[in-house]
From Swiss-Prot:
This is Molybdenum cofactor biosynthesis protein B. It comes from the Bacteria. Pathway: Cofactor biosynthesis; molybdopterin biosynthesis. SUPFAM superfamilies: Molybdenum cofactor biosynthesis proteins. May be involved in the biosynthesis of molybdopterin. InterPro entries: MoaB, MoaB/Mog-like_dom_sf, MoaB/Mog_dom, MoCF_biosynth_CS. Belongs to the MoaB/Mog family. Keywords: Molybdenum cofactor biosynthesis. The gene is moaB.
Length: 168
């Protein structure tokens, strides 16, 4: 891969945040709130209409993601439902929608999780990223540790570059 300078976009990046949980609400959703705050700190727009919570149900997840794919959004980040529990179905809902999977994201996320956060428990993560036409989707665990790691180490440093690549 060639060298890439930091890409500056001539517009505001727009994101949507979807928390997948049977137990969280807007007051207790630390993971989704953390994603929103970290994005907004980098001037990424996350409007109230583009932050919501759905149950751990494949149809609910797919319906919300498809709705946002029709809107003026650059990136969708889902939190929660990426493990191996019976109710963890985010990956099953999101992966079939992807036009292209960004395999390196999941690989790097699990590696960094192992080294910097949860040790061998990283093998339980099925975090995934990919594209749907000219939009990005990242599905990450809902813990604030996982959110910070994914956003600070992987997503935010490459977000503008990824969007630039999708739109050229």
């Amino acid at each position: 891969m060639g060298e890439h300078q930091n890409v500056k976009l001539n517009r505001t990046v727009k994101a949507a945040v979807l928390t997948v949980s049977d137990t969280r609400d807007f007051d207790t959703d630390k993971g989704g709130q953390c994603v929103r705050q970290l994005l907004q700190a980098d001037d990424v727009e996350v409007s109230d209409a583009h932050y919501t919570i759905v149950k751990d149900e494949k149809v609910a997840i797919t319906t919300q993601v498809k709705k946002w794919l029709e809107e003026d959004i650059d990136v969708i980040i889902t939190t929660g439902g990426t493990g191996i529990a019976q109710r963890d179905v985010t990956i099953e809902a999101v992966k079939p929608l992807l036009t292209k999977e960004i395999e390196g994201f999941g690989e790097l996320f699990r590696y960094l999780s192992y080294v910097e956060d949860v040790g061998t428990r990283a093998l339980l993560s099925r975090a995934v990223a990919g594209t749907v036409n000219n939009k990005l989707i990242f599905s990450i665990p809902g813990s604030t540790g996982a959110v910070k790691l994914a956003l600070e180490k992987l997503i935010k440093p490459e977000l503008n570059h990824l969007i630039h690549e999708l739109t050229k």
